[in-house]
Structure formats: structure tokens, C-alpha cells
């Protein structure tokens, strides 16, 4: 059975064209800095984002870990959102491995951190407190795009306090496509950026961490320390390069399908769904009955998968097509008896 898998854009699979690029990738030893594919990907990624250097790593979790540990010494602190991926879904690696104190502040509905909350969370220059060194933002967060004026305001705030600013940009290019801004514009306020290649962009493995030469040199040493040094990684890097060059513009199709799905579901009885919150490739909804387990079982029996932890999440991606959207709407209609 072919599943319509809307659980996440992490389930994307390489296209035939991407597989051909991987098949013919030239490789070397990346720990020695001799893999042509990795070197090409890192150079392309750094230039694309307007930064000095980049580092290819196996995962977004590792990329964020290296970023926090490169910015902060042991015993220093980072301010971030209470619902941020770094804080909630990365096993507190920055604290466990880096001894960095993570200071959460409330996350707003649009994925932002209130400037007043961040300012209040910055530790005073006093021996009783952990020195704050870093602020982390996430764009997109739950499919929502942080506005460029807000990013610039946050840059001004961190500059006032002599801090660094990191972006978890796992789905950064969704924000680029949705906002109409260039990627350089969206990342200009940040000292470092993590981008995921294996979500909507469709590569099988990997993330890029970008920043200054000095920052990436520190991150490269830490990558080796935590086991992220790879050898003939050009096969994977070639897929990432293909993704950045070929799959960014097509993210608009994912957004269009998410909107089509959201509008179809919002019209059904028994569903609570705020269309204003559907900005990229994620649709969040609730059943007015409050009981999602029977729905998930019903859908799975029909070859449809999505996440349901209280609020239901459906994510469009490279392997979701127009016919799939119609099939999902029809299945919801049947289940709800509409």
C-alpha cells in the first residue's frame, strides 16, 4: 500500500534525478578536507546565505548543538523559546554535552519571542548569575514565518547586550518562499544559521551550519568531538547541493497544497482550524469532539498518516500531490459524515 504520509516533511525521499547525482558524486575524505562534494556544498551554502563559511553535518540536531557550543563556553547561557526545537526536542544536548544553561522564555503564537521577555531573561553582570551569551530563534516555527522587521529588532537587542544570535532555520527556505524575501535578507541579522537539507528540500541526510570563518573553525573541531566527522560524505553532500539548487522554488507547491488542504478541511463540520495560521506547509487542526485516536486509526486504514498529539498536524512535502490532497479531504468528509 502507498501511504499518503503527512506526518512530517522529514519523510521525503530522493527523486530519481537526485539519486543520479549521488551515484556519480566524486568523493574524498572529508575529515582531511578532501571531499570535493562536501567542499562544493559548503562553499555554495555559505555564498547562498551571504556568510563566510559553512559546515556539513549529519543532522539538524547536531548543527544546533554545535552552534550553541561554539557560541557559549561551559557555564554560560542561551535564551530561547519554551517551545523551540532546541529546547524541547533535541534531548537538551546543549546542557548535557556543552554545560550551557538554556533559559526558556514564552513563545508567542507567531513563533516569535517578545523582546521584553528576552531582555528580562538576559542575566545581569553579577557573580550570582550564569552569563548570557546567545539568543536563539526558529524560522519557520510550526509553519509560521518570522517577519523581517522583527528579526532586525532582535538583532538590535542582542547588540545592545553584546550577545550572539543563532537561527534554527530547519525550514528556512519555506520562510524564504512564503515571505518573498531573499535568504540573505532573512539571515543577515544572525551570526549563525542552521539549515536542514532533508526536510522539504528532499535530500536524504544532512544539515548545514553557516557563519564566520572563526565560528565554523570552532564548530568543525566540536563536530569531530561529538562524532560528526564523516569520510566519503560527498555522496550525501551531492544530494544536498542538488536540493539547494533545484528544490527551493518548488516549495511553493507544498504551500499551495497545504492551503488547499486547510480550506477543504475548514469547511467541514467538527473541525477547528484557523486559516490565518497556515502560512507554509503545515496545517494544524482540532476535532471539536476532542477525540483523535479513532480518526487516526480510520485514516491509517485508508493509507493516510499524520500526527495527532492533541492538536493534529498535517505536513505537505515533495511526495504529496494534488490528488492526495483531494483524497485526504474526502476521507475526512467520510469520517465526519459531512
UniProtKB/Swiss-Prot annotation:
Annotated catalysed reactions: L-allo-threonine = acetaldehyde + glycine
UniProt cross-references to PANTHER family, sorted A to Z: L-THREONINE ALDOLASE, L-THREONINE ALDOLASE-RELATED
Name assigned to this protein: L-allo-threonine aldolase
A GO CC term assigned to this protein in UniProt: cytosol
N6-(pyridoxal phosphate)lysine PTM positions: 199
Class of enzymatic activity (EC top level): lyase
CDD domains in alphabetical order: TA_like (cd06502)
UniProt-listed InterPro entries: ArAA_b-elim_lyase/Thr_aldolase, Low_specificity_L-TA-like, PyrdxlP-dep_Trfase, PyrdxlP-dep_Trfase_major, PyrdxlP-dep_Trfase_small
The organism of origin for this protein: Aeromonas jandaei
Cofactor or coenzyme needed: pyridoxal 5'-phosphate
Enzyme Commission numbers on file: 4.1.2.49
Pfam family membership, one: Beta_elim_lyase
Subunit structure: Homotetramer.
GO molecular function: L-allo-threonine aldolase activity
Superkingdom of the organism of origin: Bacteria
Alphabetized Gene3D superfamilies for the sequence: Aspartate Aminotransferase, domain 1 (3.90.1150.10), Type I PLP-dependent aspartate aminotransferase-like (Major domain) (3.40.640.10)
Biological process per Gene Ontology, one example term: threonine catabolic process
Keywords: Lyase, Pyridoxal phosphate
Amino acid at each position: 500500500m502507498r501511504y499518503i504520509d503527512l506526518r512530517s516533511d522529514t519523510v521525503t525521499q530522493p527523486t530519481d534525478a537526485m539519486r543520479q547525482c549521488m551515484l556519480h558524486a566524486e568523493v574524498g575524505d572529508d575529515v582531511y578536507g578532501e571531499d570535493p562534494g562536501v567542499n562544493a556544498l559548503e562553499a555554495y551554502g555559505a555564498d547562498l546565505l551571504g556568510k563566510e563559511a559553512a559546515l556539513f553535518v549529519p543532522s539538524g540536531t547536531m548543527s544546533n548543538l554545535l552552534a550553541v557550543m561554539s557560541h557559549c563556553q561551559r557555564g554560560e547561557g542561551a535564551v530561547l523559546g519554551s517551545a523551540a526545537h532546541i529546547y524541547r526536542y533535541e534531548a537538551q544536548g546543549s546542557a548535557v554535552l556543552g554545560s550551557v544553561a538554556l533559559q526558556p522564555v514564552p513563545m508567542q503564537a507567531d513563533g516569535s519571542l517578545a523582546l521584553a521577555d528576552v531582555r528580562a531573561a538576559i542575566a545581569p553582570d553579577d557573580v550570582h548569575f550564569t552569563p548570557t551569551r546567545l539568543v536563539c530563534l526558529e524560522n519557520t516555527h510550526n509553519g509560521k514565518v518570522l517577519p523581517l522587521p522583527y528579526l532586525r529588532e532582535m538583532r538590535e537587542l542582542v547588540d545592545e547586550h553584546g550577545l550572539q544570535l543563532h537561527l534554527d532555520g530547519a525550514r528556512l527556505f519555506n520562510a524564504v518562499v512564503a515571505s518573498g524575501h531573499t535568504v540573505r535578507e532573512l539571515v543577515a541579522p544572525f551570526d549563525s544559521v542552521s539549515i536542514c537539507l532533508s526536510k522539504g528540500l528532499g535530500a536524504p541526510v544532512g544539515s548545514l551550519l553557516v557563519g564566520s570563518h572563526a565560528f565554523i573553525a570552532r564548530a568543525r573541531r566540536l563536530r569531530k568531538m561529538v562524532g560528526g566527522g564523516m569520510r566519503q560524505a560527498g555522496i550525501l553532500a551531492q544530494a544536498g547541493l542538488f536540493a539547494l539548487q533545484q528544490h527551493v522554488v518548488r516549495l511553493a507547491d507544498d504551500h499551495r497544497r497545504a492551503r488547499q488542504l486547510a480550506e477543504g478541511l475548514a469547511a467541514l463540520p467538527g473541525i477547528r482550524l484557523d486559516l490565518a495560521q497556515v502560512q507554509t506547509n503545515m496545517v494544524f487542526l482540532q476535532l471539536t469532539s476532542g477525540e483523535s485516536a479513532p480518526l487516526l486509526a480510520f485514516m491509517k486504514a485508508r493509507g493516510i498518516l499524520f500526527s495527532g498529539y492533541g492538536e493534529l498536524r498535517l505536513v505537505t512535502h515533495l511526495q504529496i500531490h494534488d490528488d492526495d490532497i483531494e483524497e485526504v479531504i474526502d476521507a475526512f468528509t467520510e469520517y465526519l459524515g459531512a
